[in-house]
Amino acid sequence: MGYPGVLPVLNEAVLASAVKLGIAINGKIASESKFDRKQYFYPDLPKNYQISQYDLPIVQHGALEIELADKKTGEVQRKTIGITRLHMEEDAGKLVHAGSDRLSGSTHSLVDFNRTGVPLLEIVSEPDLRSGQEAAEYAQELRRLVRYLGISDGNMQEGSLRCDVNVSVRPVGQEKFGTKVEIKNMNSFSAIQKAIDYEIERQIEALENGAKIVQETRLWEENGQRTVSMRSKEGSSDYRYFPEPDLPPIEVSAEQLEQWKAEIPELPAQKRSRYETQLGLSAYDARVLTDDREVAEYFEAAVAAGANPKLVTNWVTQDIAAYLNNNKLTISEIALKPEVLAELVNLIEKGTISGKIAKELLSELIAKGGSAKELVEKKGLIQISDPAELEKIIDELIAANPKEVEKFRSGKTNVKGFFVGQVMKKTSGRADPKLTNQLIDKKLQG
């Protein structure tokens, strides 16, 4: 906050987080690094300098692989994005513009200093991204990492994860990059993609019309779906970096590095690979399951309890996911334990209940918990799989509906659905669907 006499102290937790994230992005961890003062005058920085790292960051030369799914074919392509550095610094304040929902129309600005001085990690990426889609996926993969590592919840809407982008264009065949423009104020992954795509088109159009691109900082306006000029962009020399005199250099010993390495869990990319190779899941399903660490752990617990991985995947990514979305819950907040989901899936596989009955029980199990088997027995929902019992019901229906039988035998095979529906109605949905269809086919064709 810039109070006279206040001295900075390094938060040990941020150093551990920086090193763990550095390992996760395959970076080189510096055995020695230091802090520097970054000088600039702006309302969100009360002491007019920011404690950051300049020439000796904690992590350098990393890389992160992203997966790009083709929306039409579903095919997944992988691309490696280089990471220049990861460094520690303190956060600045937040400007709040009043009088309009846009900066360009606001009457005045307020400064929220609540996050000032809070430690953060900043990642600088190599110019390997070529589209808004790639950048958005890259940001999402970084969010997965910080969530798995327990560094942050990664919520962009709350500012836990923030992203600035630099965009430049160049003619096909030209090696030198064009003038870069920085874009700020993107609080969602879709905003990142849209802002980049808009800025690419803006710069191309400007160059084709003979205009020049100036180095500046622009703001993404969500309502206007456009970028607007904010201020000219400073160069590194404008910040007048010099070593932070109030913080000593940082040393990371080999022993400490090994300890932090041992604390790193299985990361999203490793989980995805294991799910595909060992559990036989598709790349898409593996990706959906590993997007949230809690969901992945829930899935693995259900599989460990003896359930078929592919069947559990369907329930977790479809029915349970829909319930969570509709009720704005996380998977840790539901009463349905993974072992009970495994029990429910196994009841379907054994033919004890139908998938339809299982879906009807799901909401109650999610809300109240309990045993799936006991609930089935209590409600009398055990599937009827006795051919003799089903044949008796089907014979009665055929005898009572001769006109429908005649329609079927004259070629109107869709009439079969009528008989299936009647069997389900008489058995309160407990008839084995597969066996019911087989027996009806046999009776009607006979």
Label the predicted regions.
Residues A206, Y323-N327, S354-K356, A372:
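Short, structured loop/turn "capping" segments at alpha-beta junctions
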Residues G159-P171, E276-Y298, P309-N327, E339-L341, ...:
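Core structural elements
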Residues G280, V303-V312, T352-I353, S410-N414:
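Structural motif
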